[in-house]
Swiss-Prot record:
Belongs to the YOS1 family. The chain crosses the membrane at residues 2-22, 62-82. It is found in: Endoplasmic reticulum membrane. It holds the Pfam family Yos1. Regulator of endoplasmic reticulum secretion that acts as a key determinant of brain size. Required for secretion of extracellular matrix proteins. Required for correct brain development by depositing sufficient extracellular matrix proteins for tissue integrity and the proliferation of neural progenitors. Acts as a regulator of the unfolded protein response (UPR). It is a multi-pass membrane protein. This is Immediate early response 3-interacting protein 1. The keyword Endoplasmic reticulum applies. InterPro entries: Yos1. The gene is IER3IP1. The lineage of its organism: Eukaryota, Metazoa, Chordata, Craniata, Vertebrata.
Length: 82
């Protein structure tokens, strides 16, 4: 299998899908990444854990409808061109 731009885009789509389906109460809370975790004090830089949680929440909020559309396009392309 050749490494093409389509393969790279499909891999990125799979990674974004993986982030989007993480359920906060079922999975993230069990590993200590739930919403009840403290952010930190005033004036402190947010840690990597809080930044990753913010990224996951943002992807789940913003990318819901675009992911449905992009996944549909990817399925149609796979059905048409194999």
């Amino acid at each position: 299998m050749a490494f093409t731009l389509y393969s790279l885009l499909q891999a990125a789509l799979l990674c974004v899908n993986a982030i989007a389906v993480l359920h906060e109460e079922r999975f993230l809370k069990n590993i200590g990444w739930g919403t009840d975790q403290g952010i930190g004090g005033f004036g402190e830089e947010p840690g990597i854990k809080s930044q990753l949680m913010n990224l996951i929440r943002s992807v789940r909020t913003v990318m819901r409808v675009p992911l449905i559309i992009v996944n549909s396009i990817a399925i149609v392309l796979l059905l048409l061109f194999g």
